Structures are given as structure tokens and as C-alpha cells.
Swiss-Prot record:
Lineage of the organism: Viruses, Varidnaviria, Bamfordvirae, Nucleocytoviricota, Megaviricetes
Protein name as catalogued: Putative structural protein ORF146
Keyword Transport: no
A Pfam family: DUF5757
Keywords per UniProt: Virion
Assigned protein family: Belongs to the ascovirus HvAV ORF146 family.
Annotated Gene Ontology cellular component terms: virion component
Location(s), subcellular: Virion
Superkingdom as given in the UniProt entry: Viruses
Predominant location category: virion
């Protein structure tokens, strides 16, 4: 490599050929303590001052100071010699004309506006100099004139002043673009300014000695600014720097007021609250972006750019937002008696929707002061905001400093007539209580975005470790959730549980019947679990069975009772403790394990009443006393398949399980808890006590009301964990509810408090829910879990209408917290039996014989309900609105569009508008769509939608282009191309292929990236089957349907799992993909390449989702890979035909709206037409038509008029292999009948029409 030597003040540097001039300048500037904007000129430049840095025959000139001095009125010598100045400046401008010309102009304008009043006249020399530099004309001719430059300076200054006022009002809040590098020079200190804005030009790195934890990076925009404008502020105090002398870090901070500094550990922390950068000059088409300011060791703050896909707009007001008080565009409302504020801003990164919100709603912010939840009361909204229709805009709840504020996020795009269209995210904040909260939430949302960007790899690692993706690959479960998504009132759940009651109809006659046939007592089984059997004669008592005589009263004869129970063979009497029947039946017969004194005549008085013993096990669903256990609900045992998994000799000896004989036949029991509002807390405490050792009997644990109140108060620090379940309550209401010890502690809504407070997994089991009960859990060969449900949904379940349930909230958020606790408890929520009267639902705990094993099975079941991706919640459909129209998209149409959009992706949808359900019926769902020449949707059901532009066609909706009035034709050729029936088939192919492309791109990710680890573990089909898709994907790439850059961006944005439920599904996908591509001709593929919607469709909506699992592709291939339109379909009735009249004269007849325009054809013309038909070549026949118009074809209403119609040109084409002929009829230029078609039917129906092969003129 060639080198040269450069001597700078006695130091020799080696210069390589690869060094750019900029690098050489930096080397010299570093040695001579100059900046990189200093330009080195030969010594012949006489205007350079003597104290300028020199190196050999060159001297360094600071162009900024040099040009400012030339036009500065404070210069005693006046401007420099024009010839010298132009020669020197022009030689420097020639090095980089585009950037250096702007720099020179900025220097002159800055000098002029800094040292002169705006009303001063621009002197002639300044005009000549500006002309010479800007026009590159050294002759000095005044081209523009003083007035031109005076307006330039005045507008520049006016815009700066307006910008200052807007910043002071905190209006026009948008992120902006920044790029900064190099260092500051140690120069003089800055000066203070009061809300004034001027530029620091140059590219610098910000140095601050003490890093701020989270600098605010919300940036303000300006319509026209200088090259690089930077403003630093500390709590509203603005600093103005002299651009010639940028300050050091110490001097910059010392100039700021210290009264607003905060102290942490007796150290004052310096905060830089705002900074602003604008790159560009005099261009209304601005570029915005998010800039990230982060602390760096030894440097202070470094500024970097997060992304650069910001929109460019041609009208600044279309992107400018309003934020603050007063002025235009500010929304101030009076909600609930107080003034609230609403504002919006944009983030030019759509990752905010797909990744950021998903992450922060899943994390639930357990240890943070601010949390994000989903507002389930605003799941669908339709509004015309910011001149755009936003059909799907769920709201989120943000908790900030004990305030609950709602915000929404929508994906929007700029106006359709802008050259560069890019989507961005708009955040709208609703009903903030004050401006501090308004600005604080905006700051925090942006800061969270930055946090996510900076910790993206750590977050991905966290999900990989905690979400147990290996266990979720093949799960297909029904989501079981509480059907009532409303705040419960006391006794409401108990009332619901008692709605369905199956009463036992006892038999009234016969032998060997139940004792309840002769004793009419309600809820007999509640007191006696083992009921005796009745016979009329003592001879009917089975041998070996003891019996007693019983008098049923009411004049009935005595009967004999015996017990048909092996574990309770002895009949006896017990005092009747059931309310309402004790007078008629003071004693009730029952079966016991031991003999009792149960003679009927021995029970005449209370002193001889049988002894009442303490019962330790109950077979009914009554509320248990503290000294007893109860039978576990039958459905819970069936669901867990306890006969299969629990009847094992390998029980868990380290966990308590009751050893009483009465419990021997049960593999799961429920434990007793005191009745009260804090029963859920006590149930967890007793269950956790059981898990400590095999001797830790929970019945021995003494828990008082004061202890429960203390535990409840301790949970207040975890209240944010339950924020999603309590989305409909403000932070103050949540705290008040938790502080009130008399209010019901609802485990359905506060389960996460129990989990984090007691460090245990809590699984809820509710009796009385109306969802389909679970029958069992089955394990696959790969040890995954599948749930089975009872087929008979309507059958009666007695008191055991039980389901495994999760707290109610929107399906987009997850139930299971990120932390997997070592211990697990199961809570049983019920309301006792029919006669139980409770103020609140009762909560008990469930113990299993093999507790650890069973709860682990339940945990895997709950993991099947783990978080669905936020993109399943968010499928944005956005429509840009034309400014000139006043038409609004009606609600039915909007909901119908969204319904069709979802149904086309295999999703189930229930649309809501103002709390009124809109069914997906034929009344609201469009039946057809009309698309224009570039594949955009312009009409529905034959009605043009003026208010929407650039809308994606709906793949599942038929295309109908018969409605010609919707189209605006620029020329006749455009009309013929649009009305070509092939066009509909091509557009259909486009949308089928685009959806197919998305799936194939996902499914081949493992093949393309098989050497990496990004997607390799996220598929259930092996490499061999993926290799079968190579040819299909390669054909897509080669055809240009999608490029590899878009494909990689798709992977980066999506990072989604696309799975197949079976090998058959994967094979069917490969087959349909290959079949669809084989059906497409090369011409059709080339047409699809022209569609600009292909890459736009590669977005965030997950295809092939189902109710059971959003991660599985389940037999939904047929929903989008349909058979293409038959090529024999003709969208238009032939308006032109050949026919014979009554005189056997041939007519050429043209029909328009049932009016027939015809002309008789003479023999010569008929012969000429027949010859053309018999020919194998393409021929053209033209003739004038002098016609008679027949009204409705009725001779009685003949109304003749003569006119000269356009010359018709018949293009006749004969199929070389068939006997049929296709004709195309066109006309001369600009005829109203242009572009119509007709055909002559073939003799054989199978040989009719092939429009695909028709060659158009």
C-alpha cells in the first residue's frame, strides 16, 4: 500500500492511500487543536489572520468564523474583499457542493440574525456574496435581489420564534431524528436564555459527569431548522450556546440553575430533561425517529438512533400532534366533575405494538411503580381520529403515581399521495387528571420502549427460560375461564350455584327402597351420608343384616330398616338437626360403623336421645367444620384421572395426607376453612402448612381474625400484580378494597397476590360455572398434556358442576405469572349445598394423596393457557381518509369489514360497538368487493367507499368488477386493462399467494437458518419434511414475489412460532403450496410481481389461528388455498351478437340496458365476416353502423331515430384446434362502448371460451 508522510508542527504522520480527506483533516486538527470544520488552504490566501494554525505552506481557516466575519456589521474593516472571499469559499464549496453550500448559507443567515435586527436591509455585498456562493457564479451578478434574502432571513427568524412558543406550551410533541459524533472543545461558558432556541451546529457527543438514570427523550419538532439544532434543558430552563464556542460538560451544567437538582445519598444528581435534534434544511418533508440517550462509562451520555423507518410527509400538519394546554388541537374534557386532558404522540417504530406491549403486559410489573394492563371494556372501538379510520383499537391502562390513565395504540400510515408511505404507532392518552401525569406517562412510555430495545436479548432469554416452550408445542386445550367478567357482589356466586338443582324423587312404595321414601325431609343426605334401606316386613331383611323398627308417623305402619353398607352396617337414630323438619321428625335413622342404642321406644325424651359424635369426613358438598375433611368433587378427580395417576404405592411421604379410615377410599380430600371474607387467605395458609411435613395436620393450625387481617395488609405491596384482573378499578379503589377487612377477598381476582405473598402456585377450582366440564387429562407419548371434555354438555351434574377455572380477563393477557414457584396449592371455591346461606362464596383447599405429582400435572394444564401473543389481540385495520370527502364509514360496514378480515384468517370474531353485539350475519357482512387496477379495494357490494383508500382486498370475499361507475379512467387502454376479466383472477392469485408466502416463509425458516439457533427449536416438523419446501420457496424468491431482505425483516419483527398439529397438516401444506404455484403461469407470476402489496402483507397478523391454540396450524389450509376462478368464467354478458331476423337477414346486434342497437348486414359483409371466421389468422373487420333503436325489444313501442354510431372493429380469432371462435369488440378512441366483450358459443360446451389466451389490442 502506498504511503506518504505529513509533517505537522514537527511531528511526522504516515498517510495511507486509504485515508479519506476527512480522516487527514481530523489528524491535523487533533495535532493543532483545531476542529474538523477548519479547512486547510494554501498560503496564498491573504485574508487569513496571522494567528491561524499553520502547517508548512498551509494554514487552517475556521469557515464558520470566517464567513460570519465577512458579513458581520461589527467588523470594523467591513466585509472582506469579494474576490478573495468568493475564491476561497468557492474552492471549499467545490469539495462537497451539496452539504457545504447549505453550511455556508446557514453561517451567513446565522451571522445576520444574531447581530442584526430583522428589519435591517440586506446590504448589496451580502446579496452578491450569497448569489456567488449559492449560484456558484463568481461574476457577482445579483440574481435574486435583496428582497429575496430579506424574506429568507425573516421567515427563518419567525419560524424559530414560533417554535420557541410551541416548546414553551409543550405542543407539537413528536420524536425526531438525531445523529451525533466527535467531541466538544474546551471553550467559554454558555449564557442563560429564557425559553429561547438557537442552534448548536456540528456533530457532537453529549458529555455529562453524573449519568442520569433515565433521561427524557421526547423530542420536539420544528418545520424548518438549521443543519443540526440541539437544545438542552434542565426542568424547563433552556440554554443558548454560541455556536462558535461549544461549552464543556462542566461549564454547561454550571450555567444551569441548581435549585431543581435532586439529592440521592447526599449527592446532587444532574438531570438533562430534554434534548432536540433536527437534521435537514428548509424541507417540509421531515424525517422523524426515536433517539436513545444512555450513559456510557467515562463519556457521560451517548446518543444513538433506535430506528429510521419514519414517514416522510408532504404536509407538516398531518404529522404534528398537540400535547398540552390551550391552543388548537387540544382536547380538554370535564369527566366526573373534574377537568381531564387528552393528547397523542407518535412513535416511528411499530414494534411498540407487536413486542413492547406484549412484553410489559405479560410481565405485570411486579416490582415497578408503573404497570400496563388491558382495558377489557374497550376491546373494540371505531372512531374517526386524525383524519383516519381506526377500526381495531383496544385501550390499555397505565398506572402512574397512583393515577389510572387509559391509552390506546394504533398503527397508522401517512396520506396516500405521499411518495414514501411507512406505518407508525400513534399513542393516544385519554383523560389524564393533570398535565404532569400527561407528560409523565408520555415520557415513561417512550422510556419503556427504550428499555425494551436495550434489553431485547435479555428479555428473549427470560422468555426462553420461563415459558417452557417445549411443553407447549402440541397442546390443544379449551380455555376454561369464568363466564362472568363483572365485579361480583356478595352472595352473587352462591345464587348462581343454586340456580340448577336436581331433586331426588324418592319412591313411595315397594320394598328395599331408600329411607327418604317414607321420611319427607329436605337435604336428608346432608346429615346422614349412609342412608338405611326400608322393607315392609321383617322377613324381607337380608340374612346377616341387623335391623331396627321405625315408626314414620302420620298414621303409617311401622317399617324395618337395615343398612346395606359394608363400612356402616349398623342402623341407628340421630337427633334431627335439619332446619324446618325437627318437629315432625325429631330423630332420623342412619347407618353407623358401630352399634348404637337405637330402639324406637328408647327415644321418647331428650335424655334418652342417642349420643351425637363428631364427624371427621363428609361425602356431601357442605361447608366443613374445622375438625373434618370432605370428599373432593368428583369432576376434579375425573379430570385428573386419579384412578390412573394417584392409585400408586409411591405416595408423597413428605406431604401431609389424612390417615383416617374413612378417607382410605379417597385419593383427594378438601380441607376445612373458617367461613368469612378472608377464607381464601386462610385456605392457602393451611395448604402451605400441609406441605411442610407429613405430620403437619392443617386442622391443628390456629388462625385468628387478626392474623388474617395482618396477612391481608401485607399483600398491599403486591397489589400491582393483580392489576390486570382489577382493570376496571382505579388504584385507589384497589387499595381501599384490600384495606377493608370485611370485604370479600375474591381469589378469582386476587390470585396473584396469594401467589407472590406465599411464594406458591395457586390453582383455582370453581363449582357452579357453566362451561363444559373436563373429564380427564391424557398424556401423549412425548409427555405433553391434552384435556378431554364430557361430550354431553346438557346433562345434569348434581352438585358437582365443577371446572378448573382461571381468573377472568381478556384472552390477550396471560394468567400464569412468569415465576414458577416450587410449591403448589389447589383452592376449591363453592357455596355449600342448597340450604347453605353464605354472604360470600366459600374457599377451601384440596389435598392429594400424591400431592406434588398431581399439582405438577395441574401446572402443566395451566401452562396450556399461557400468554397468547399481543398481535392476536391487535390486528389493526387502518384506512386513510381523503381530506376532500365528508363521508364516514358507518358502523355496520366497519364491523363487517373487520369480521370478513378476521374470518379470512380462520379467526372467530364477536364484534362490539357501544356495548351492542353485531353478529357476522348476511345483513352486515359484504358479499363482494371491487378492486381497482393496482389491487386496491374501492367498493363493497357495488357501493363505492369514498372514505377509504389503499385498503387491502379481503382474501375470502369474491371479486366483482362489474360496477364500472366506480372507476376513473385516465385513458381508454386503462379501461380495457381494468375490465379484462383476467384481472380479477390475477388479483385473486395475488392475495392467495401473499398469504401462502407468509406461511411458507415461516415454515422454511428452519431450513434457511438451520445453522443458527433463532428459529430452529420452534417447529414440530423435522428437517427432512422442510427440505421438501425448498423448490417452492426458491421459486418465490426467483419470481421476485418477496425478497430476502423482506424475509429477514419478517423474522426479526415476528419472532413467532408457527407449528403444525400433525405430519398430515405439513404434507397438506406442501401439496397445496406446490399445487398453487404450478397452476400459475409465467405471465401471472410476472403480474403478481408488480403488486406493491405483497411485502406489506408480511406483517403482524398471525395466520391459521384457532380458538384452541394460537400457535397451531389446524386444518385451515383450505380457508385460503381455494381453487382458482374457472377460466371459463365471464364477468360480462355478451353485449354484441350475430342473429337472424324473420327474413333470415343477419343482424349485428348490440345491447345496452335492454335497448338493442342493431344493423342489418348485407350479403357482401356477411361473406366477409364468414371468411374471417373460417380463417386461422387474426383479422380485423370494420364497418359503419346506421342503426335503429328498439325500445325494450317490443315492436309495439318502436321509436325510430337515426344516428351515426362509432365504427366497430371486430377482432376475430379462430382456435386452431377447435371449431369455436372468440370475438373481441372495441371501438375508436374515447367511445362510451369501449372495452366490451362478446363470444360465440362453441358447439361443444367443453370447448367454450378461454379468455386467458385471448390477445388484446
Amino acid at each position: 500500500m502506498n504511503t506518504s508522510v505529513l509533517n505537522v508542527n514537527g511531528i511526522t504522520f504516515t498517510i495511507y492511500d486509504s485515508y479519506t480527506p476527512q480522516v487527514i483533516y481530523m489528524i491535523i486538527a487533533d495535532r493543532l487543536n483545531t476542529t474538523t470544520r477548519m479547512v486547510w488552504f494554501p498560503e496564498f490566501v491573504s485574508t487569513v489572520s496571522d494567528d491561524a494554525p499553520r502547517s508548512g505552506v498551509h494554514s487552517a481557516v475556521d469557515m464558520y468564523m470566517y464567513i460570519r466575519d465577512m458579513v458581520s456589521p461589527s467588523n470594523a474593516d467591513g466585509p472582506r474583499s469579494l474576490s478573495d472571499a468568493v475564491q476561497m469559499v468557492k474552492s471549499w464549496v467545490d469539495r462537497d457542493p451539496e452539504s457545504n453550500t447549505k453550511f455556508v448559507e446557514h453561517c451567513i443567515i446565522d451571522a445576520y440574525t444574531s447581530n442584526r435586527e430583522v428589519n435591517d436591509d440586506v446590504d448589496a455585498q451580502t446579496c452578491v456574496l450569497l448569489d456567488a456562493i449559492i449560484t456558484q457564479d463568481v461574476t457577482g451578478n445579483d440574481i435574486h435581489g435583496p428582497e429575496y434574502y430579506r424574506e429568507v432571513v425573516r421567515s427563518f427568524r419567525d419560524r424559530c420564534m414560533e417554535h420557541s412558543r410551541n416548546i414553551a406550551a409543550n405542543k407539537r410533541l413528536v420524536p425526531m431524528y438525531v445523529t451525533m459524533y466527535s467531541n466538544w472543545s474546551n471553550t467559554t461558558a454558555p449564557t442563560m436564555a429564557n425559553m429561547d432556541v438557537e442552534a448548536i451546529r456540528g456533530k457532537y457527543t453529549v458529555y455529562v459527569p453524573e449519568p442520569d438514570e433515565r433521561p427524557t427523550v421526547i423530542l420536539f419538532n420544528d418545520l424548518v431548522m438549521s443543519e443540526d439544532l440541539v437544545v438542552f434543558a434542565k426542568y424547563g430552563e433552556w440554554l443558548k450556546y454560541d455556536a462558535r464556542h461549544p461549552p464543556t460538560a462542566d461549564t454547561a451544567l454550571s450555567a444551569m440553575s441548581r435549585r431543581t437538582g435532586t439529592k440521592v445519598n447526599n449527592r446532587e444528581r444532574n438531570h438533562i430533561a430534554l434534548f432536540m435534534v433536527r437534521r435537514g434544511i428548509y424541507s417540509p418533508g421531515m424525517t422523524y425517529d426515536i433517539a436513545h440517550v444512555y450513559p456510557a462509562p467515562g463519556v457521560g451520555y451517548t446518543i444513538s438512533v433506535l430506528s429510521n423507518n419514519a414517514p416522510t410527509v408532504d404536509v407538516p400538519r398531518s404529522i404534528t400532534t398537540a400535547m398540552g394546554l390551550g391552543g388548537d388541537g387540544i382536547e380538554v374534557s370535564d369527566a366526573g366533575g373534574g377537568v381531564t386532558y387528552t393528547a397523542s404522540f407518535v412513535l416511528n417504530d411499530i414494534t411498540f405494538v407487536t413486542e413492547y406491549l406484549q412484553h410489559f403486559t405479560l410481565m405485570k410489573c411486579t416490582n415497578k411503580a408503573t404497570c400496563i394492563f388491558i382495558d377489557e371494556t374497550h376491546l373494540m372501538r371505531h372512531a374517526k381520529e386524525w383524519r383516519r379510520f381506526t377500526i381495531s383499537s383496544p385501550r390499555f391502562i397505565y398506572e402512574y403515581n397512583n393515577y389510572t390513565v387509559r391509552f390506546s395504540v394504533t398503527v397508522e400510515s401517512t396520506r396516500r399521495d405521499v411518495a414514501r408511505v411507512a406505518p407508525y404507532s400513534r399513542i393516544r392518552i385519554y383523560d389524564a387528571p393533570n398535565t404532569n401525569v400527561l407528560y409523565g406517562i408520555a415520557n415513561d412510555i417512550t422510556s419503556h420502549m427504550i428499555q425494551y430495545k436495550s434489553e431485547e436479548l435479555d428479555i428473549l432469554k427470560f422468555y426462553t427460560e420461563h415459558l417452557h416452550t417445549d411443553e407447549l408445542l402440541n397442546i390443544n386445550v379449551r380455555v376454561l375461564r369464568d363466564s362472568k367478567r363483572v365485579k361480583r357482589t356478595p352472595g352473587q356466586l352462591a345464587g348462581q350455584h343454586r340456580q340448577v338443582r336436581r331433586r331426588i324423587q324418592a319412591q313411595r312404595d315397594g320394598d328395599h327402597v331408600d329411607v327418604r321414601s317414607i321420611i319427607n325431609v329436605n337435604n336428608y343426605a346432608r346429615q346422614c351420608a349412609k342412608l338405611p334401606t326400608v322393607v315392609r316386613s321383617v322377613d324381607l331383611v337380608p340374612d346377616g343384616k341387623e335391623h331396627i323398627t321405625f315408626s314414620p308417623g302420620r298414621g303409617l305402619p311401622d317399617v324395618y330398616l337395615y343398612c346395606n353398607h359394608d363400612d356402616a352396617p349398623y342402623p341407628g337414630l340421630a337427633a334431627n338437626r335439619l332446619a324446618g323438619n325437627s318437629d315432625e321428625h325429631p330423630f332420623l335413622p342412619c347407618c353407623y360403623r358401630v352399634r348404637r342404642n337405637a330402639a324406637a321406644d328408647a327415644c321418647d325424651n331428650d335424655s334418652l336421645a342417642p349420643e351425637v359424635r363428631s364427624q371427621t369426613f363428609y361425602n356431601t358438598q357442605r361447608v366443613l367444620p374445622l375438625t373434618a375433611f370432605g370428599k373432593c368433587p368428583g369432576n376434579l378427580e375425573a379430570m385428573l384421572a386419579v384412578q390412573r395417576y394417584c392409585r400408586s404405592t409411591d405416595t408423597n411421604s413428605a406431604t401431609f395426607y389424612p390417615k383416617e379410615k374413612v378417607v382410605q377410599g379417597a385419593t383427594a380430600v378438601r380441607g376445612a376453612v373458617q367461613v368469612g371474607p378472608n377464607a381464601a387467605i386462610e385456605a392457602v395458609m393451611r395448604a402451605v402448612h400441609c406441605l411442610q411435613s407429613s405430620t403437619a395436620d392443617p386442622r391443628s393450625l390456629v388462625i385468628g381474625a387478626e392474623q388474617l387481617e395482618r396477612e391481608r395488609s401485607k399483600m398491599m405491596e403486591y397489589i400491582t400484580c393483580a392489576g390486570q384482573e382489577l382493570f376496571d378499578m382505579s388504584s385507589g379503589e384497589r387499595l381501599s378494597w384490600l384495606k377493608d377487612n370485611t370485604s370479600y377477598f375474591d381469589p378469582l381476582r386476587l390470585v396473584k397476590l396469594l401467589q407472590y405473598h406465599f411464594d406458591t402456585n395457586v390453582f383455582l377450582y370453581v363449582r357452579g360455572s357453566t362451561v363444559k366440564p373436563v373429564r380427564s387429562i391424557a398424556k401423549t407419548e412425548s409427555q405433553r398434556v391434552r384435556l378431554k371434555f364430557y361430550d354431553d354438555y346438557t346433562q345434569a351434574w348434581n352438585d358437582n358442576e365443577d371446572v378448573l377455572s382461571i381468573p377472568y380477563h381478556y384472552a390477550g393477557a396471560d394468567y400464569h405469572d412468569m415465576k414458577i414457584h416450587e410449591r403448589s396449592v389447589v383452592l376449591y371455591v363453592h357455596s355449600g349445598t342448597e340450604i347453605t346461606t353464605l354472604a360470600h362464596p366459600h374457599v377451601e383447599y384440596v389435598l392429594f394423596e400424591n400431592h406434588c405429582y398431581i399439582t405438577d400435572t395441574i401446572r402443566k394444564t395451566y401452562q396450556a393457557l399461557l400468554p397468547q401473543p399481543m398481535r392476536a389481540v391487535y390486528s389493526f385495520v387502518y384506512f386513510d381518509v381523503d381530506d376532500a370527502t365528508e363521508e364516514e364509514l358507518d358502523v355496520d360496514t366497519a364491523n363487517a369489514l373487520r369480521a370478513i378480515y378476521y374470518v379470512s384468517k380462520g379467526k372467530q370474531l364477536s364484534a362490539h360497538w357501544r356495548d351492542v353485539a353485531v353478529a357476522n350475519s348476511d345483513k352486515t357482512a359484504p358479499r363482494s368487493q371491487t378492486i381497482d387496477g393496482v389491487g386496491r379495494l374501492i367498493g363493497m357490494d357495488g357501493v363505492q367507499l369514498e372514505t377509504i383508500r389503499s385498503v387491502e382486498p379481503l382474501p375470502s370475499l369474491p371479486i366483482d368488477n362489474h360496477h364500472h361507475s366506480m372507476f376513473s379512467f385516465h385513458d381508454n387502454m386503462n379501461r380495457r386493462e381494468l375490465l379484462n376479466p383476467e384481472h380479477s383472477a390475477k388479483c385473486t392469485y395475488t392475495w392467495y399467494l401473499s398469504k401462502l408466502t407468509r406461511v411458507l416463509l415461516h415454515l422454511t425458516a428452519y431450513t434457511i437458518l438451520k445453522k443458527g439457533t433463532l428459529m430452529s427449536e420452534l417447529f414440530t416438523v423435522d428437517e427432512r419434511r422442510f427440505n421438501l419446501l425448498h423448490d417452492t420457496i426458491n421459486s418465490l424468491f426467483e419470481a421476485g414475489v418477496v425478497d430476502r431482505a423482506s424475509y429477514m425483516n419478517l423474522l426479526i419483527v415476528e419472532q413467532d412460532r408457527v407449528l403444525t398439529d400433525s405430519v398430515d397438516t405439513a404434507r397438506r401444506l406442501v401439496y397445496n403450496a406446490s399445487l398453487l404455484l404450478r397452476r400459475m403461469s409465467a405471465y401471472e407470476t410476472s403480474e403478481i410481481r408488480k403488486s406493491r402489496y405483497i411485502t406489506e402483507l408480511l406483517r403482524y397478523e398471525t395466520d391459521f389461528t384457532s380458538d384452541e391454540s394460537p400457535f397451531s396450524i389446524v386444518t385451515s389450509i383450505d380457508k385460503f388455498i381455494l381453487k382458482p376462478r374457472p377460466k371459463t368464467v365471464s364477468l360480462f354478458r355478451p353485449p354484441l351478437s350475430l342473429k337472424h331476423d324473420d327474413t333470415n337477414t343477419v343482424l349485428v346486434q348490440y345491447s345496452v340496458d335492454k335497448h338493442y342497437l342493431s344493423r342489418r348486414v348485407d350479403d357482401a359483409e356477411l361473406m366477409r365476416l364468414s371468411d374471417a371466421m373460417r380463417s386461422n389468422t387474426f383479422k380485423e373487420i370494420s364497418f359503419d353502423m346506421f342503426d335503429t333503436l328498439y325500445g325494450n325489444g317490443d315492436d309495439a313501442d318502436v321509436r325510430e331515430r337515426e344516428r351515426t354510431s362509432p365504427t366497430l372493429i371486430l377482432h376475430v380469432w379462430r382456435n386452431e384446434t377447435s371449431s369455436w371462435t372468440v370475438l373481441e369488440c372495441t371501438d375508436d378512441v374515447d367511445s362510451e362502448y369501449a372495452g366490451v366483450y362478446f363470444h360465440l358459443n362453441a358447439a361443444d360446451p367443453k370447448d367454450r371460451i378461454t379468455l386467458k389466451r385471448l390477445t388484446l389490442c
